[in-house]
Each structure stands twice: as structure tokens, then as C-alpha cells.
Amino acid sequence: LLYSRFWYKFLYDLGVVPTKEPYMRRTSHGMILGENGEKMSKSRGNVVNPDEMVDTYGADAFRTYELFIGAFDQSTPWSTQGLSGCNKFLDRVYNLKDMVTDSPDYSPELESLMHKTIKKVGDDIEKIKFNTAVAALMSLVNEFYKKGSVTRGEYKTLLILLNPFAPHITEELFEMMNFGGTLSASSWPAYDEAKTIDQTVEMAVMIGGRVRAKIMVPADMAEEDIK
């Protein structure tokens, strides 16, 4: 990685490039270790063949797991079970197509969560926090299943947000749902900042130093009014 800067400095001295530094910030990825937590090597017998993983679970599941496995810049042990989990997650995304309603809008009960998820996934991608972006999408899918349905608007947004991590299945689903055009050429969904802010918060009711109940109150309610 240091060579990128070394060669750039050399080119700068020759007057080929306009600036002294090649980049404002450099991020290097961590190492994927064997399942035993040690560095992968043939002598240790803990090498994972990516071709075999793709043949078994598919390229999308493999790609999603690689980005979900941990923080981008941290070394993390491999887990075939974790890859299987990402494969099941994509299966759930695929099966959602049978639960889609005709509404082009977000459902009232999930509107706030949709805007929060759009904001989080976009911000996390820019900050190279891919693992937490995928986690947010997993949570969103869980909410769709809890509700028992997903609107066309919600499903379209989900596919666009998931596309950077699982491009093949999302593009296929986008076409199957007749959303129009290609997913890769679609605009990133916008969010309303006001709708990312919780309107109510949960507060514990304590009696005698012990929590006796929990109530929901407006987020902007004054402390005296709550009392």
C-alpha cells in the first residue's frame, strides 16, 4: 500500500501529476482469517476456497457475507455458517416478492423505518461501514415479515439499497417486478430527515426503585409534563 504513495511522489517530481499526495485518506481492508482464528495457509489446512463457496452458495451470498463479516479494516475469522446465514437472508429477500402489495408508497407503520434505513445505508456505505449497512437491511426485512406484507414502494427501495451488496439477485428481482428500466441505472432513494426522527420515545415508570411499567411519550414533551 505504501508503494501507491511512493510511485505518486515519483510522478509528482517528474511533473506528471498535479498534487503532492495521491489521496486525502487511505483505507486498507483487514485480513480474513481461518475459522480457527489463525492466518489462512495450506500448511495449517484452514484455507477456504472461494470458488467452492460461490459454487455452493452463489456469488451474491459470498459477496454479501464478505462485506457483512466484520468491520472493513479489521481482521476477522471466516465462518461458513455465517455465509449460510447470508444465503438464507437473500432467500428471504427473494421470497418477499410473493408478499408485495400494489401500493407504490411506504406503509404508514414502516414509513419512518424506511427513511431511517435509507439514511443509514447511504451513510454507512460512504463511511465504508458495510457490515452495519447490511445489518440494517436485515432488520428491515425482518420488519416486513413481521408485518406480513411489503408495498411495491418498499420492495423497490429495498432492492436498490441491497444492490451494492448483492447485485445479481436484486437486478433479477427488479426486472421480475416490472419496476421499469434497470436497477443499476436507478436513482438512489431519497429520505426525509424529519421522518428519521422518532416522534415518541419509550420511558420506564419506576416505583420504589424498580421498573413497574414502560410507556410511550412524545419525544419533545417536557420533563415536568411527563411527571
Model-derived regions: residue spans:
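Alpha-helical recognition segments enriched in aromatics with Gly/Pro capping
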Residues: 1-72
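Generic structural signal for hydrophobic residues
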Residues: 3, 7, 158, 169-170, ...
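Helix-rich, typically C-terminal accessory recognition domains appended to large enzymatic cores
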Residues: 16-22, 52-216
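Generic "edge-of-domain/loop-turn" microfeature
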Residues: 33, 210-212, 222
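Short clusters of small/polar residues that mark proteolytic maturation junctions
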Residues: 44, 216-217
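Amphipathic alpha-helical transducer elements in NTP-driven molecular machines
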Residues: 47, 87-90, 223
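Glycine-rich, small/acidic residue-mixed loop/short-helix segments
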Residues: 217-227
